[in-house]
């Protein structure tokens, strides 16, 4: 699917971030599969402390098509205020911010929340990246 963003600098940044995120998917899946096989975690159960520690430095990002859908949904709704729970490294937040920007509304705002301080710091750096 072609990108709806029409912003080459942002698209380049997101391309890099999506590649980094995709590189972690197999390791993350293997970690949870191994935990299930070991009997230390049942399928479809809430995350325990070990899982939280494992994920604390991982990108937990929407796939590109889902992030683009969120962008298009915010555009269609002419969203001016968006709250995201679980910003992680800020990939989906960049899509949400682009939608609010492209809606050309006064006083638009995107609020991202993140539990892990190091992820929040990386997200802030991604928001400041030239895009």
Q: Which stretches of residues belong to each language-model region?
A:
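A short alpha-helical cap/connector motif
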Residues: 1-131
């Amino acid at each position: 699917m072609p990108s709806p963003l029409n912003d080459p600098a942002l698209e380049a940044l997101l391309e890099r971030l999506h590649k980094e995120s995709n590189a972690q998917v197999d390791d993350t899946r293997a970690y949870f599969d191994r935990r299930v096989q070991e009997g230390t975690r049942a399928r479809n159960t809430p995350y325990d402390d070990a899982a939280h520690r494992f994920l604390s430095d991982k990108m937990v990002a929407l796939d590109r098509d889902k992030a683009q859908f969120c962008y298009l949904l915010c555009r269609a709704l002419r969203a001016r205020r968006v709250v995201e729970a679980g910003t992680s490294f800020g990939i989906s937040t960049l899509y949400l911010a682009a939608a609010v920007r492209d809606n050309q509304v006064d006083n638009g705002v995107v609020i991202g929340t993140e539990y892990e301080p190091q992820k929040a710091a990386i997200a802030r750096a991604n928001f400041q990246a030239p895009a």
